[in-house]
């Protein structure tokens, strides 16, 4: 008689994904972030669902409803801060997950990688529309500035912006549709995450050495279920420390003021996880050029499989590429800092140089390093 988990139509799927999945024996803690992203998504959907029960998507009452959640709803303050900081946790895990993919050459699984890029775009869209919902000063002006960027698109730009706004400015119609988008997008992300996993399990996981490990794979359970569970516990510990001790550390003080279309904040900036892209956008004086650079800063990831020149998959034994990878990470941290600074010297030139270095590293330096390493190894 076969075991039920191996024969039952539904349990069979779960079994193939979480129990009997053949997994490389040497994957490190950096491979935990996929499951941690799943945990973050579930956390965000659950906290978001409870917030949606008390939130009203109307310009007159949106700000008050968030205040009501924090003051009058049982543990509303906790749910609200878990949701707000959960977005930061999500992006920390997401960026580490992408960084691991670049470092160990996981982008060579093209289908999985491209679905991942689509997931990144959708997550960024979800976070952006969600940031508008509390209807504070930075919410309102952030929505105005970022949606206005679409007006740079030739010919249809202005019509497109007014179509998204549902009027001639960011108003009630905009808030209502942003709430609708913010509610539905996480479920689309969850469905795409399943497709992401489906494509990954077609090829099997990569490993730090970047070599085939079919001959010595081990079952996912109990080895990696235990390892993932440890990751979840550690991350929740850090996350709850942030939520309970420093809930407003990553937020903007301007969002504690209700949205006022007649008063512009001195420095409009998005949440910290978008600052690197915002810095790239601002580094180009031309509006359309800035928008193109902004989109390309993320879309450039899709080129990585085609820019891979090394005969080795992973960067584990490629010191030249490793150095460039850490230069790229440092550059992104620099761009994140610049994105939060006002547009004045010396920040303008630093932002422009950091933006050039970002594109130069990915498009030119990393492929060149791969070729040089091949030459040095006489491959």
Swiss-Prot record:
Q: Which UniProt keywords apply?
A: Electron transport, Heme, Iron, Membrane, Metal-binding, Mitochondrion, Mitochondrion inner membrane, Respiratory chain, Transmembrane, Transmembrane helix, Transport, Ubiquinone
One GO BP annotation is: mitochondrial electron transport, ubiquinol to cytochrome c
Where are the bilayer-spanning segments? 33-53, 77-98, 113-133, 178-198, 226-246, 288-308, 320-340, 347-367
CC cofactor note: Binds 2 heme b groups non-covalently.
- Binding residue positions for a ubiquinone: 201
Query: Which Gene Ontology molecular-function terms are recorded?
Result: metal ion binding; ubiquinol-cytochrome-c reductase activity
Keyword presence, Electron transport: yes
Protein's name in the database: Cytochrome b
Q: Which organism's genome codes for this protein? A: Thomomys monticola
């Amino acid at each position: 008689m076969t075991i039920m988990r191996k024969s039952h139509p539904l349990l069979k799927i779960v079994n193939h994904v979480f129990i009997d999945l053949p997994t490389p024996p040497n994957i490190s803690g950096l491979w935990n972030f996929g499951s941690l992203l799943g945990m973050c998504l579930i956390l965000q959907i659950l906290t978001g669902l409870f917030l949606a029960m008390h939130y009203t998507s109307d310009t007159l009452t949106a700000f008050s409803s968030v205040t009501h959640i924090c003051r009058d709803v049982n543990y509303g303050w906790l749910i609200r801060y878990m949701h707000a900081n959960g977005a930061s946790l999500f992006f920390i895990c997401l960026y580490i997950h992408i960084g691991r993919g670049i470092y160990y050459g996981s982008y060579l699984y093209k289908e999985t990688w491209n679905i991942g890029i689509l997931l990144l775009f959708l997550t960024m869209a979800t976070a952006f529309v969600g940031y508008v919902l509390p209807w504070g000063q930075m919410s309102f002006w952030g929505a105005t500035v970022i949606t206005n960027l679409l007006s740079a698109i030739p010919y249809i730009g202005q019509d497109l912006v007014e179509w998204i706004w549902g009027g001639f400015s960011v108003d009630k119609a905009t808030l209502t549709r942003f709430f609708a988008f913010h509610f539905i997008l996480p479920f689309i992300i969850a469905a795409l995450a399943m497709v992401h996993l489906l494509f990954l399990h077609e090829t099997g996981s990569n490993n730090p050495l970047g070599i085939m490990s079919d001959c010595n794979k081990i079952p996912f359970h109990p080895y990696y279920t235990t390892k993932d569970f440890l990751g979840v516990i550690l991350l929740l510990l850090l996350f709850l420390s942030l939520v309970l001790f420093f809930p407003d550390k990553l937020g903007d003080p301007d969002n504690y003021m209700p949205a006022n279309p007649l008063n512009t904040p001195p420095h409009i900036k998005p949440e910290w996880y978008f600052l690197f892209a915002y810095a790239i956008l601002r580094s180009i004086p031309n509006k359309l050029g800035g928008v193109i650079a902004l989109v390309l800063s993320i879309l450039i990831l899709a080129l990585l499989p085609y820019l891979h020149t090394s005969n080795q998959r992973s960067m584990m034994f490629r010191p030249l590429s490793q150095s460039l990878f850490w230069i790229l990470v440092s550059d992104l941290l620099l761009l994140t800092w610049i994105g939060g600074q006002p547009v004045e010297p010396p920040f303008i030139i630093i932002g422009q140089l950091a933006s050039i270095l970002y594109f130069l590293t990915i498009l030119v330096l990393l492929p060149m390093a791969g070729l040089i390493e091949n030459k040095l190894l006489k491959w």
